[in-house]
Regions:
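Bacterial N-terminal signal peptides that target proteins for export
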Residues: 1-11
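C-terminal lobe and pocket-closing loops
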Residues: 121, 207-275, 304-307, 321
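N-terminal signal peptide c-region/cleavage motif recognized by signal peptidases
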Residues: 16-19
Length: 322
């Protein structure tokens, strides 16, 4: 009898110890790593979500910009952080699904990171320079087939989502267009406006002002539905290329080993922040659709994205460091 009582007491103490951290969490400031410089889409999304999280938990949420290597450096810093819930990150598709497939990064997103929630998706849009004689996808594909190897597409860098979206276009449409990589979206945009390159995939909010001003011509949007801010632009499905649907996405992650009860608290706080109307409004301006799913669903989503882009990389023969 004493043995049974001792076991029951010990088990109760273990349960109490396991739940205590979550009951007290968060008791101090949370550091939210953004693996990109201030001012970009990743940074804006993180700041809007982080500010509301801070108001919910009555604790500061410090934004820590750790830009470099397309989001890899900041994500590496997160993977090495103490797994106590006080250091988290909102990272992107590039750092969580593409770079680990192409580069020798110091983390495995599925083993070294703990999924918390998929925060938002932002569709990629295909645009052409105004001197390109194509007003829609059918005309663009016909032009490329008539001039194999003569048309080109810009990207924000080798292995970036815009790069792989361009490679996916080549595979899907069976066309030969040349990749022209840049060091970031801004120089790619400058040369698009200067008609030095002919087409590019980029996040919708980056392109929208230039489409409105007539500086670029929209061809298709890589989203399931048309964007409220650009209803005149058809989706890739509407133009007959559903497999070309391409969205940048941003997810909240913690270091692997973060206790499940703390992950649950982080998930609850983040998803609650995403339900606030002002948060939705601010991020809708950025072209972002808020998600807010479970850790398990986000982990499965990351797996599917890694598989998808690994296949594109292989099928397109994209050079990798691995």
């Amino acid at each position: 009898m004493r043995t049974i009582r001792a076991l029951v007491t010990g088990f109760a103490l273990l349960l109490s110890a396991a739940s205590a951290p979550a009951e007290d969490f968060p008791a101090r400031q949370i550091r939210l790593i953004v693996p990109f410089p201030a001012g970009g889409p990743n940074d804006i999304i993180a700041r809007v979500i982080g500010q509301r999280m801070s108001e919910i938990i009555k604790q500061p949420v410090l934004i820590d910009n750790r830009g470099g290597q397309g989001g890899v450096l900041g994500t590496e810093a997160l993977a090495k952080a103490t797994p106590d819930g006080y250091t988290i990150a909102i990272s992107s598709a590039g750092a969580l699904a593409i770079s680990p497939t192409m580069e020798n990064v110091a983390y495995d997103p599925l083993k070294d990171l703990q999924a918390v929630t998929l925060v938002a998706k932002v569709p990629e849009m295909l645009v052409v320079a105004t001197d390109v004689p194509a007003k829609n996808m059918a005309e663009l594909v016909a032009l490329a087939k008539a001039k194999p190897g003569k048309l080109n597409f810009a990207s924000s860098g080798p292995g970036s989502l815009p790069h792989l979206a361009g490679e996916l276009l080549k595979l899907t449409a069976k066309i030969d267009i040349v990749h022209v990589p840049y060091r970031g979206a801004a120089p790619a945009m400058n040369d698009m406006l200067g008609q030095q390159v002919q087409m590019v995939f980029l996040d919708l909010p980056i392109l929208l002002p230039q489409i409105r001003s007539g500086g670029l011509r929209a061809i298709a949007l890589g989203a399931p539905e048309r964007a409220p801010t650009a209803m005149e632009v058809p989706t890739t499905t509407e133009v007959g290329m559903p497999e070309l649907q391409t969205e940048n996405w941003y997810g909240m992650v913690a270091p692997a080993g973060t206790p499940a009860p703390i992950v649950a608290v982080l998930n609850r706080i983040a998803t609650e922040a995403m339900q606030v109307p002002t948060v939705k409004e601010k991020l809708a301006i950025q072209g972002a659709t808020l998600i807010g799913d479970s850790p398990e669903h986000f982990h499965t989503f990351m797996e599917s994205e890694i598989t998808r882009w690994a296949k594109v990389i292989k099928d397109a023969g994209v050079a990798t460091e691995k």
